[in-house]
A protein has these predicted regions:
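Extended, compositionally biased repeat/scaffold regions that form elongated interaction surfaces
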Residues: 61-409
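Signal peptide processing junction and immediate N-terminal pro/mature segment
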Residues: 22-40
Length: 409
């Protein structure tokens, strides 16, 4: 179970220590809507594999693997007298054994959370050492000093193959935090973090997803606590991870981006990254009139407090763009695309309706012409689908061409 460098006598002690801290399962937490409204959504089943390489909120879909390792003792409490014992000027002159013993004493010695030792010092790779206790372990490295591993974070670290896995050696002790009113703790490692919360359990974060997570935190848009490990989409090289405040999705061609709230719910209804929207290509961005939009491989999602969340793509997005997007005369979408007569589709916006047919491009119909169009039963009537945008004519009038004729105003 341990490195080949560990003597067989110490390996037995390690097994004893590990057997004492049972692993329990915790379910993912629900997420609060912020800043856009949310409805519950489910996610396709995908395979969980840690991938060290590697955009407002809903509940984590129950179909996801959200197994957590939480341990007997809640790990969201700071270690008593838990000052940093990294390799500083104050303790660098101490031997590894002395630094480990000092760390153990700071934590209450045999009466603390670690309890009594079950081994002596065991050598590890790169000149590091470990000592086992009834309630956990203490690691020592020349670069980072002595740091304890215990509780739910300890169990999650074990699942990642300890220091020989993608996280490497611990670089800090456990630190208590509260995010969004949820109590938890954080411990850092050479190549990532493990975060534990009272609702989501303990999960590692690393790579590109960790980079995006930390950027969001620095911008005051925290995603909260992780509720799953990083999940790899084996089909196309992407990965994602769910949090109490949303999700982060990564793909080599798009980078890592947050998806939250109403936009996340809409995306979930489109089969997530496997649907026509694909992976997110940008962050949620504030725009006209208090709304937001987010771009995806297949189009753009728009949310506004008075209209809700809708998706615009392909030819409709082209026509919408020609008219100035949400800043133009048509405003925000009021519906998704809807199939219509003869293989065509339409989409309703605040300022008019866009139509598309396989035999033509996408065009808007609005105002007085839209009234005439409605009188003739829209695209299902004798006028059929529009073939042009509205065009100014003499004396301030306008006209618009349709499959079945031309309207004038």
């Amino acid at each position: 179970m341990r490195s080949s460098l560990i003597a067989s006598s110490c390996a037995a002690a390690a097994l004893l220590a590990l057997s004492i801290a049972p692993i329990s399962l915790a379910s993912p937490t629900s997420e609060a809507d912020a800043p856009t409204p949310s409805t519950q959504a489910s996610s396709p089943t995908q395979t969980e594999t840690p991938t060290p390489e590697a955009s407002p909120s809903t509940s984590v879909p129950s179909s996801l693997d959200s197994t957590t390792a939480s341990g007997d003792t809640p790990t969201g409490e700071s270690i008593p007298n838990g000052e940093d014992r990294s390799a500083t000027d104050d303790n660098v002159s101490l031997s590894p054994e002395e630094q480990i013993r000092q760390r153990w004493q700071d934590m209450g010695a045999e009466n603390g959370v670690l309890g009594t030792a079950t081994s002596g010092l065991v050598p590890l790779r790169d000149g590091a050492f470990i000592q086992f206790y009834r309630g956990g372990q203490i690691y020592w490295t020349a670069k980072f000093g002595a740091h304890a591993s215990r509780g739910g974070i300890h169990s999650a670290y074990s699942a990642q193959k300890w220091e020989n896995g993608p996280l490497g050696f611990p670089t800090s002790d456990e630190e208590a935090q509260t995010i969004g009113g949820i109590r938890g703790a954080l411990q850092t490692y050479e190549n990532g973090q493990i975060r534990w919360s009272s609702q989501g359990g303990a999960h590692p974060i690393w790579g590109k997803i960790l980079e995006r997570y930390e950027i969001a935190e620095s911008e005051g848009r925290s995603l909260g606590w992780p509720t799953t490990n990083e999940m790899k989409d084996a089909a196309d090289g992407g990965a994602y991870q769910h949090f109490t405040g949303g999700s982060i999705y990564f793909h080599p061609s798009t980078g890592a981006h947050r998806v939250t709230g109403g936009i996340r719910n809409l995306w979930a209804g489109q089969s997530w990254e496997r649907g026509q929207m694909g992976y997110p290509t940008g962050e949620e961005t504030a725009t006209a009139g208090g709304g937001v939009y987010q771009t995806f491989q297949g189009g753009a999602a728009y949310w506004h407090p008075r209209t809700g969340t809708y998706y615009v793509h392909d030819a409709m997005l082209g026509a919408y763009g020609r008219a100035g997007y949400e800043w133009g005369r048509y405003g925000y979408p009021l519906s998704n695309e809807t199939p219509s007569a003869n293989g065509g589709v339409y989409q309703i916006f605040q300022g008019g309706t866009a139509y598309w047919h396989p035999g033509s491009d996408s065009y808007f119909v609005h105002d007085a012409v839209l009234g005439t169009y409605a009188y003739y039963n829209w695209e299902r009537g004798e006028l059929g689908y529009p073939l042009t945008d509205e065009t100014p004519s003499a004396n301030g009038g306008i006209f618009q061409g349709f499959q079945g004729g031309t309207t004038y105003w």
